[in-house]
UniProtKB/Swiss-Prot annotation:
UniProt gene name: aroE
HAMAP family named among the record's database cross-references: Shikimate_DH_AroE
Chain sites annotated for binding shikimate: 19-21, 66, 91, 106, 231
Organism of this sequence: Halothermothrix orenii (strain H 168 / OCM 544 / DSM 9562)
Chain positions recorded as NADP(+) binding sites: 131-135, 155-160, 229, 252
Assembly and binders: Homodimer.
NADP among keywords: yes
Catalytic residue positions: 70
Catalytic reaction equation(s): shikimate + NADP(+) = 3-dehydroshikimate + NADPH + H(+)
Name of the protein: Shikimate dehydrogenase (NADP(+))
Length: 289
């Protein structure tokens, strides 16, 4: 039952048809007995500024931000957290009395997933990131902060990848970062010698599932950890390709839960562990690839 004291949070993006966040958050709020509700807020690009202003006008407690707005929301916020500023992308906004502050819990969620669900130690490893959007910024920051020796960024638009690599080279001067085109002849010898491949693109996401994996199966070895941040469907074409060669695989569902749990703490002040437990228990194990 909603009343005047109900705290409203939500997910801001476009489109939102694939998202499980509302069901996940509302399940946790119900189980924990807190007076919150989580709403999908599909906002077309021409109305992003008005959408942000609406958070103040309607006194929302905050929102998560997803594709395509993680970078675009920043100019409309009053303040951003240090990590979010370093990454250059925001996925969580907190409204404190009309003052909007941006955070990035994607980075925290990704780090926890690698450590807890993949048992993967980043330090000294060679990593491949596919895609140069907001999620790749968070992933790259985690890898660099935790001491990866080399990071290769693959993107269809090489110019966009090169721009992000330029930022990383300045922010993390001790880490070798290289931009490569999604051209099999160029990336194949590099990717085959890497320890982890992380796909941050929406390729293979429901409902628009089509085509093969974003990189050639020949680039994956049985010693590679293959991570696809897409979680619906649980087995993307990239995950399937990884399994076919005997590689370890992980989809993005644990990261989704963890980043949500950290956002939950920012909004409610409640420990993220209390969010994680009921959500994990309610989710089919099929989601954990």
């Amino acid at each position: 039952m909603f009343d005047n004291s109900t705290q409203v949070v939500g997910l801001m993006g476009y489109p939102l048809g694939h998202s499980m966040s509302p069901a996940m958050h509302n399940r946790a709020y119900k189980d924990l007995g807190i007076n919150y509700v989580y709403l999908p807020l599909e906002i077309k690009p021409d109305f992003l500024k008005e959408g942000i202003e609406g958070l103040r006008a309607f006194n929302f407690r905050g929102v998560n931000v997803t594709i395509p707005y993680k970078e675009k929301v920043i100019p409309y916020l009053d303040e951003i957290d240090r990590l979010a500023g370093e990454i250059g992308a925001v996925n969580t906004i907190v409204n404190n009395g009309g003052k909007l502050k941006g955070y990035n819990t994607d980075a925290l969620g990704f780090k926890k997933m690698l450590e807890d669900d993949c048992s993967f130690e980043i330090k000294g490893t060679k990593a491949v990131i596919i895609g140069a959007g907001g999620a790749s910024r968070a992933v790259g920051a985690v890898l660099a902060r935790e001491g990866a020796s080399e990071i290769f960024l693959l993107n269809r638009t090489l110019k966009k990848a090169a721009k992000l690599v330029g930022i990383w080279n300045k922010t993390y001067p001790g880490i070798k970062t290289v931009a490569l085109p999604l051209d099999e002849d160029k990336y194949l010898p590099v990717v085959k010698r890497c320890d982890v491949i992380i796909d941050t693109t929406p390729v293979g996401m429901a409902p628009g599932i089509k085509g093969g994996p974003v990189i050639a199966k020949e680039a994956i070895t049985r010693d590679t950890l293959v991570v696809d941040l897409v979680y619906n469907p649980p087995e993307t074409t990239l995950i399937k390709a990884g399994r076919q060669v005997g590689a370890r695989t992980m989809n993005g569902f644990p990261m989704l839960i963890y980043q949500a749990a950290y956002a939950f703490k920012l909004w409610t002040g409640i420990k993220p562990e209390l969010f994680i437990k009921p959500v994990r228990e309610a989710i089919s194990p099929d989601f954990f690839a």
